[in-house]
């Protein structure tokens, strides 16, 4: 689990310039240095560990968690960790309706799958050169926008967001559907938009990497707990012995005989 040393080394304590702050983050601010707000890492550590446990427990219950982060500093790191633990992610651009109009998104994903099926079967080679080029361009665009959510069969139970100030549409859709939001909370962000905030720098690459790493580890730990629970439940469950029809009839006859003899 994250330590104070990790937070310091990754620059999690550096907020934004004082003129860019959101006054609602005042309770998370330790002070000011060269017109930069410094985040109170004691509070960050406490919120980090609490949120880690929340994410771990959600994962242990089999809940799905989506990663969202489209800005330049975050997109490759977020994709790396999301793919390593096989969770859905959006790292290029959030398409409106990704959550609130999920059925339409699924139709677009199906288009991507159909194009791939055409490639695998060789059917695409029967098209004209121009048609083939158009379809491959379509595939490239769909994969860029939807590649991270192509295996997502339902809306997620929770989303982890890098930079809630930038990902306004994603945050608004999640809130509309009452999907809990986990996010680092920089000094320019609104704490009221985040269910499980972690006060910290959401701009520095090392800080972003730390957040992604810890959330990924929480999810993996949760999955391990779920597997242990399943194994434990199986070990403690008694094997059910089913009575055959013949045995059932024989037993009923014996009971009937005992009742008759008792009546005499």
Swiss-Prot record:
Native source organism of the sequence? Helicobacter pylori (strain ATCC 700392 / 26695)
Q: Which UniProt keywords apply?
A: Ribonucleoprotein, Ribosomal protein
Keyword Lipid metabolism listed: no
Q: Does the keyword Signal apply?
A: no
Alphabetized PROSITE patterns for the sequence: RIBOSOMAL_S2_1, RIBOSOMAL_S2_2
Protein name, please? Small ribosomal subunit protein uS2
Q: Which family would the database say this protein is a member of?
A: Belongs to the universal ribosomal protein uS2 family.
Under SUPFAM superfamilies, the record lists:
Ribosomal protein S2
GO BP annotations of the record are: translation
Q: Which InterPro entries does this UniProt record tie to the protein?
A: Ribosomal_uS2, Ribosomal_uS2_bac/mit/plastid, Ribosomal_uS2_CS, Ribosomal_uS2_flav_dom_sf
Q: Name one GO molecular function term.
A: structural constituent of ribosome
The organism's superkingdom is given as Bacteria
Q: Which PANTHER family match?
A: 30S RIBOSOMAL PROTEIN S2 PROKARYOTIC AND ORGANELLAR, SMALL RIBOSOMAL SUBUNIT PROTEIN US2M
Q: Which GO terms describe its cellular component?
A: cytosolic small ribosomal subunit
> Secretion signal: which residues?
none
